[in-house]
Swiss-Prot record:
PROSITE patterns assigned: INTEGRASE
Residue ranges annotated for the Integrase catalytic domain, each copy included: 101-268
Highest taxon above the source species: Bacteria
UniProt-recorded name of the protein: Putative transposase for insertion sequence element IS986/IS6110
Matches recorded under InterPro entries: HTH-like_dom, Integrase_cat-core, RNaseH-like_sf, RNaseH_sf, Transpos_IS3, Transposase_IS3/IS150/IS904
Described purpose of this protein according to its UniProt entry: Involved in the transposition of the insertion sequence.
Amino acid sequence: MPIAPSTYYDHINREPSRRELRDGELKEHISRVHAANYGVYGARKVWLTLNREGIEVARCTVERLMTKLGLSGTTRGKARRTTIADPATARPADLVQRRFGPPAPNRLWVADLTYVSTWAGFAYVAFVTDAYARRILGWRVASTMATSMVLDAIEQAIWTRQQESVLDLKDVIHHTDRGSQYTSIRFSERLAEAGIQPSVGAVGSSYDNALAETINGLYKTELIKPGKPWRSIEDVELATARWVDWFNHRRLYQYCGDVPPVELEAAYYAQRQRPAAG
């Protein structure tokens, strides 16, 4: 059906509606939040972030506008196992038995390592994570998958807690899979010096250290795969430092009640410092 010229020009010259103006503003905020969080947030986390910032908006509106913008979240793939067991080395008992929900910080630390392909060869990455709030306490990037790398990661974890005046680590269980780096004499001696109890998965399945592998999977999905190709180990190290800071302080983690790990830890300690009611 033909459209009268006056109707056409009225349409293109009309003032935008309030909804259109609001949508335009929200699109800018949505794009900003999505980009600031490594492009990994879906509509739910973008919506939560906007509301945390004081920008009140319905989740369905965020979903609608993200569709228009062509934005979506990421889905974590299946992680590959990296550690290799040493059958000749004695292993500590499994003190965790796949229970990864401790009642407080500094009860269970989990550790694992993964690798990143670069133009200069493989970069190996080790993480130490406190299971209570899924906070990464220590990490290290190295060119070899050696005991020194996991030692550096545990040293950083110990140092992190020392900066927070946590000096007594006797209640900490350090849980890993059967990788030879974690069952070496040097590593076992360092845990003993710190008063940390070692634990190694009993069965040898990925489920034995599922939380640590989850952290590795998020790292690969949120940072490594979107950032390919990686030119050097140094590039991986710098990017990992930024990602860990974001992960701990800004990333909304569903397990933590959709707050960052550091925020959940702070809430735990604040609750303990409150005087009892009555």
